[in-house]
């Protein structure tokens, strides 16, 4: 089963990115043989892909969560237009995260058995 997570919020300030990644990690842990996880970072969520961020007190480390998902075979892409609008398109991203496009998001959506939007 192919599950697509579309995340829209910044890594810190709300718990949307955290909850999306927590769900993705749980699916990878408990449904290893039947689930393929894909994550598309959209809008302010593209900043989730920046390495070495300071984790605010009381929050979980989003970088660590993304790395765990990637290390278990999850695919993570960040919207190029959103990255450019936020001035991060030329910056180094977490290893395994690729700048992508709405065309890719459309393709992933068509291929997904389920799409979850946070």
Predicted regions and their residues:
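C-terminal structural segments of small proteins and small subunits
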Residues: 85-118
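Short glycine-enriched, charge-decorated loop/helix-capping segments at active-site entrances
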Residues: 52-57, 93-95
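A glycine-rich helix N-cap at a beta->alpha junction
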Residues: 55-81
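Acidic, glycine-rich active-site loops and adjacent beta-strand->loop/helix elements
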Residues: 9-10, 43-46, 82-85
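Histidine-anchored nucleotide/phosphate-binding helix
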Residues: 17-30, 39
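Primarily the HKD phosphodiesterase
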Residues: 34, 39, 48-51
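Short internal beta-strands
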Residues: 24, 36-43, 76-80
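Short, glycine-rich nucleotide/cofactor-binding loops
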Residues: 4-20, 49-54
